[in-house]
From Swiss-Prot:
This is Glycine-rich RNA-binding protein 3, mitochondrial. SMART domains: RRM (SM00360). Residues 1-37 form a transit peptide. Its main location: mitochondrion. One of its GO terms (cellular component) is mitochondrion. Disruption phenotype: No visible phenotype under normal growth conditions, but mutant plants exhibit severe editing defects in mitochondrial transcripts. The lineage of its organism: Eukaryota, Viridiplantae, Streptophyta, Embryophyta, Tracheophyta. Residues 247-309 are annotated as: Disordered. Transmembrane segments: none annotated. PANTHER family: HETEROGENEOUS NUCLEAR RIBONUCLEOPROTEIN 87F-RELATED (PTHR48027). GO terms for biological process: cytidine to uridine editing; mitochondrial mRNA modification; mRNA processing; response to cold. One of its GO terms (molecular function) is single-stranded DNA binding. CDD domains: RRM2_NsCP33_like. Keywords: Mitochondrion, mRNA processing, RNA-binding, Transit peptide.
Length: 309
């Protein structure tokens, strides 16, 4: 039994090796067939909107046998979007069509004819062409694409360095260096941009922020220490209407000096207080009441002295 099992394993390994060798030998021909298929398919851009698949086939049939034609339509309106595809039976026919029609007038418009690549690659529709991944209209390097194009990550409204991008250096981007960006150095940014978190206009180091700026509660700010409504400014602890050093404070009018222990209406050295008019040592006080008219010179101790004399 063990011998049979071992023999079966050896036979299985041998069969797998033979199959792998056959697949490796046939792979170049398979890849070549795929390459030929892709090189025989063309992308046509800038087409007249009046062209349909029949008119497209008619225009390209003179350069070789056409297998398939396709005009890309808008999903909502059903109208042509201005580009399409033509597939030939051979790459030679496709090459002839490119040489004859690329940059030429077709039904009143100058068309762009090139090899059609996959959507993920570059150079054709979906790659370097309209709406593709890199360098084309809506691609990663084209208009509205991911990098460097109109609306791309490095282009107008793109993600990095573009006008309105969301990375750095773009107008309205949210990273660094962009006008209105959320990172550092941009107008309205978080770090050193105006209106951001630090050092900018309205930020923590800018106007109306939390530190060293106007309108905030930290130091050296308007409304902070030493400014209006701050702890050392108007209405603060040492200013007008505050508790120390200002009007209506503890040492000001209405505070401790005036109307307090050393002012009018106070306890010790003021009018109507002790030691002043109406106080303990003044008219009507308890200490001088014995020398008034009731117990004055007539009928007092002086009369007794006269009688004794």
């Amino acid at each position: 039994m063990a011998f049979l099992s071992k023999f079966g394993n050896i036979l299985k390994q041998t069969t797998n090796k033979q199959l792998n060798a056959q697949v490796s030998l046939s792979s170049p021909s398979l890849f070549q067939a795929i390459r030929c298929m892709s090189s025989s398919k063309l992308f046509i851009g800038g087409m007249a909107y009046s062209m349909d698949e029949d008119s497209l086939r008619e225009a390209f049939t003179k350069y070789g046998e056409v297998v398939d034609t396709r005009v890309i339509l808008d999903r909502e309106t059903g109208r042509s979007r201005g580009f399409g595809f033509v597939t030939f039976t051979s790459s030679e026919a496709a090459s002839s069509a490119i040489q004859a029609l690329d940059g030429r007038d077709l039904h009143g418009r100058v068309v762009k004819v090139n090899y059609a690549n996959d959507r993920t690659s570059g150079g054709g529709f979906g790659g370097g062409g309209y709406g593709g991944g890199g360098g084309g209209y809506g691609g990663s390097g084209g208009y509205g694409g991911g990098a460097g194009g109109y609306g791309g990550s490095g282009g107008y409204g793109g993600g990095a360095g573009g006008y309105g991008g969301n990375s750095g250096g773009g107008y309205g981007g949210n990273a660094a260096g962009g006008y209105g960006g959320s990172g550092a150095g941009g107008y309205g940014g978080d770090a050193t941009g105006h209106g951001g978190a630090g050092g900018g206009y309205g930020s923590s180091g800018g106007f109306g922020s939390s530190g060293n700026t106007y309108g905030e509660g930290s130091s050296a700010s308007a409304g902070a220490v030493g400014d209006y409504n701050g702890s050392s400014g108007y209405g603060s602890a040492n200013t007008y209407g505050s508790s120390n050093g200002g009007f209506a404070g503890d040492s000001q009018f209405g505070g401790s000096p005036v109307g307090n222990s050393s002012q009018f209406g106070g306890d010790n050295t003021q009018f109507t207080a002790g030691g002043q008019f109406g106080g303990e040592d003044q008219f009507g006080s308890m200490e001088k009441s014995e020398t008034k008219m009731e117990d004055g010179p007539i009928g007092g101790e002086f009369e007794d002295v006269a009688k004794r004399a």
